[in-house]
Design a protein with these regions (language model features):
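A contiguous loop/helix-start segment that scaffolds small-molecule binding in enzyme catalytic cores
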Residues: 2-5, 10, 86, 165, ...
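Glycine/small-residue-rich loop that forms an oxyanion/phosphate-binding "nest" at active or ligand-binding sites
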Residues: 67, 74-123
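Conserved helicase motor
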Residues: 64-72, 144-149
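Short active-site oxyanion
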Residues: 34-40, 113-117, 165-166
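Alpha-helix capping/helix-boundary segments
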Residues: 46-48, 95, 124, 174, ...
Length: 247
């Protein structure tokens, strides 16, 4: 299967979004790039080959790994390839750089004046915000919270008076603990949503307040998880926040 009616791929670096889970969300431009890019820099080479197979297309270019632990070392090699051809950057799901590899390559491209463009598409952050049912006109995305309880609680404390909606990813193994800490620090009655397995067969959007969601998550929340917490208000500030500090 070939994708017709599209312009030839440009020289340089292409950042392309891949489906979160439903291959039907793959854009025509992504499919075209997978077929014709000279080099595909993939977070997981097996995943991108499986995606191409699911889409019924063949990859003609070279596929190399480009993940968190090797992307800085890989950047120069990819920039050299992009100087005379097309390098397609994809991650396991969603948009490169958004809590995923890609930044080192884009920074190196800017230094070498190599063109960079984007083939937009699926992303968990706006998808979760749209499905949350919360007031999310302004939001703060903070990737993954710290893994250890101490730094995680300090992170939540720093968000106590954040008026924008807060969106972050979390491991299913830690989400119950994180939600319980958020309920304790931000307020158990703070509206929130847990978005699980977005666009996949078992997609689930669980809405409620932080206290309710923390209790629900104790039984186990599987899959890839995005959490959205509604922003606070001036009325939500704690008494301690309102006590004038001594000069």
């Amino acid at each position: 299967m070939s994708v017709l009616g599209l312009d030839p791929l440009p020289r340089g670096v292409i950042l392309a979004a891949t489906p979160l889970g439903n291959v039907g969300d793959a854009s025509a431009r992504l499919m075209h790039a997978l077929q014709h890019a000279d080099v595909i820099a993939a977070e997981d080479t097996r995943r991108v080959r499986n995606l191409a197979q699911a889409l019924g297309i063949e990859i003609s270019g070279r596929v190399v790994s480009n993940f968190d632990h090797n992307e800085k070392d890989r950047a120069q090699q990819l920039i050299d390839a992009a100087a005379s051809g097309t390098v397609l950057v994809v991650t396991d799901a969603g948009m490169p750089i958004i809590s995923d590899p890609g930044l080192s390559l884009v920074s190196a491209a800017a230094e070498r004046d190599i063109p960079v463009t984007c083939f937009p598409g699926p992303s968990a952050v706006p998808t979760a915000l749209a499905l949350s049912g919360l007031g999310v006109g302004h939001f703060l995305f903070d990737a993954f919270p710290p893994r250890k309880p101490g730094p995680r609680k300090a992170w939540l404390e720093s968000l106590r008076n954040e008026k924008r909606a807060i969106v972050f990813f979390e491991s299913p193994h830690r989400v119950a603990e994180t939600l319980a800490e958020a309920a304790d620090i931000l307020g158990a009655d703070r509206p929130a949503a847990v978005c699980r397995e977005l666009t996949k067969t078992y997609e689930e959007i669980r809405r409620g307040n932080l206290g309710e969601l923390a209790e629900w998550a104790v039984d186990g929340a599987r899959g890839e998880i995005t959490v959205v917490i509604e922003g606070g208000t001036a009325a939500a500030a704690t008494a301690a926040d309102l006590v004038p500090k001594a000069l």
